């Protein structure tokens, strides 16, 4: 029994890039890398500037949005046109369907979030490549966890994009900035802790790396 179905993977890719979501998936990394180039030209190799760009824009905005766009486009077309019932009626385990869809979403995160994060980090801090590597690895953990969370939303509601945006704005954004304890239940903060440890930064205070990794694995 295959854990991943190539046919379902192809359908997943088509459902993402055959709609407006595919355009946004290309725009977001271009914005990140473009702003990194601009910041480098204006302020040089600034530690503060690189953190604002890679964390404030990359981990907080680009990574979760890429994951949301990728996962919301995987099941929505089948649910909207009713073909999901035919897909579920096929002699394919549901676990294979879910894993195949998640593979597509995670691949999108790697291609449109993690790789651009690495490139942006190298542009901003050529003197310290560990910064780029740290944020890229953090985006892998965070992006994969977001894919798992948003995939669940796409199954339970047809308004996964709206619910996902509310979650990002309220929990990860508003409450995450106001309440210090939210870091223990924040995917973005778990990602930042990985970047902290690899690059020697202090984006998130008093959050053990083992907890961040374990929490991410639990969500996935």
Question: Language-model segments: which ranges?
Answer:
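Aromatic- and glycine-rich beta-strand/loop motifs that create alpha-glucan
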Residues: 1-26
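Alpha-helical transmembrane segments of multi-pass membrane proteins predominantly involved
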Residues: 21, 191-195, 211-212
């Amino acid at each position: 029994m295959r854990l991943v179905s190539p046919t379902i993977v192809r359908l997943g890719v088509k459902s993402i890039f055959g709609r407006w979501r595919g355009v946004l998936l290309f725009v977001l990394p271009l914005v990140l890398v473009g702003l990194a180039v601009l910041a480098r030209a204006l302020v040089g190799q600034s530690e503060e500037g690189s953190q604002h760009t890679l964390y404030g824009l990359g981990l907080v905005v680009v990574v979760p949005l890429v994951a949301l766009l990728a996962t919301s486009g995987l099941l929505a077309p089948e649910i909207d046109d009713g073909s999901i019932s035919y897909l579920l009626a096929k002699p394919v385990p549901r676990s294979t369907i879910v894993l195949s869809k998640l593979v597509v979403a995670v691949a999108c995160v790697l291609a449109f979030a993690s790789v651009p994060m690495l490139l942006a980090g190298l542009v901003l801090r050529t003197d310290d490549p560990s910064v780029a590597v740290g944020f890229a690895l953090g985006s892998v953990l965070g992006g994969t966890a977001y894919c798992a969370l948003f995939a669940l939303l796409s199954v339970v509601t047809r308004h996964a994009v709206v619910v996902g945006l509310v979650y990002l704005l309220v929990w990860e954004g508003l409450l995450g900035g106001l309440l210090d304890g939210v870091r223990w239940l924040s995917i973005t903060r778990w990602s930042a802790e990985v970047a902290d440890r690899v690059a020697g930064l202090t984006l998130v205070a008093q959050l053990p790396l083992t907890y961040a990794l374990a929490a991410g694995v639990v969500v996935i």
